């Protein structure tokens, strides 16, 4: 389950519902009533948020413009119940002539909701990767919304000119409502664009309405890119696109901080399967390079992958792009 590339802190701590405060009273019945009332209030706050509308609206917009058909993954992954018997996981997977995989995962129980929506292109197209990772609990919302660059922008400035410079106004429209959310590691920042909305906030009707609006605007911008992009005919460029997407998927499948939550919900084996075969499908199909091949700095003395979130130790507490989208570090 993908919440973000890497936040520089443990996501796991955010998935625990806060203990409702105990009010001292001479009456045990009154204490129990207060606890139940507070707990109900927390549950209502979570249930008031539904990300189903986000997925439905995105798919509706897509079907207006292109022909979608079910991915082969839809038959294998559609729904799942957590080990607790209460948590529901709902999955959708589609494809088109240009889109290799358009998929969604929604996780919901009494104390949290998670929404992960992503779009990956066929290797013949260099369009960015659509990335929406939203988490809502009783006390916090964590949001990452971006058009992740297929090719790292520090290496290819023409790629930024092609896809980002003309749509920076979308980011500026929501920057004040959704300010920068805190540290991002130096390793993960390479996979984000200057459009990225990385934020944390307390729930409110106004905030979630603004988030829905931002989600649709980002998605419509990405959808327009997929329609306008021309097929790459040069074999070397297709190979470069394929390897770039494989590198991205390999990073996400290995270092996604949502792994811990999935493990608790469905067990270690099923969590790894969901990460590699559904959420980041393509790791085993688009290339043969390993995580260490792409990121040798993570190799330990015994040849395994380090569990550390960051090796270089650099993080960005403030937004590392200027108003024009240029990286300033």
Swiss-Prot record:
One of its GO terms (molecular function) is phytochromobilin:ferredoxin oxidoreductase activity. InterPro entries: Ferredoxin-dep_bilin_Rdtase (IPR009249). GO terms for cellular component: chloroplast. The keyword Oxidoreductase applies. Residues 1-45 form a transit peptide. Its EC number is 1.3.7.4. Keywords: Chloroplast, Oxidoreductase, Plastid, Transit peptide. It is found in: Plastid, Chloroplast. It catalyses: (3Z)-phytochromobilin + 2 oxidized [2Fe-2S]-[ferredoxin] = biliverdin IXalpha + 2 reduced [2Fe-2S]-[ferredoxin] + 2 H(+). Disruption phenotype: Elongated hypocotyl phenotype due to defect in the tetrapyrrole chromophore phytochromobilin biosynthesis. It is an enzyme of class 1 (oxidoreductase). It comes from the Eukaryota. One of its GO terms (biological process) is chloroplast-nucleus signaling pathway. Its main location: plastid. Gene3D superfamilies: 3.40.1500.20. Belongs to the HY2 family. Catalyzes the two-electron reduction of biliverdin IX-alpha to the tetrapyrrole chromophore phytochromobilin (PPhiB). This is Phytochromobilin:ferredoxin oxidoreductase, chloroplastic. It comes from Arabidopsis thaliana (Mouse-ear cress).
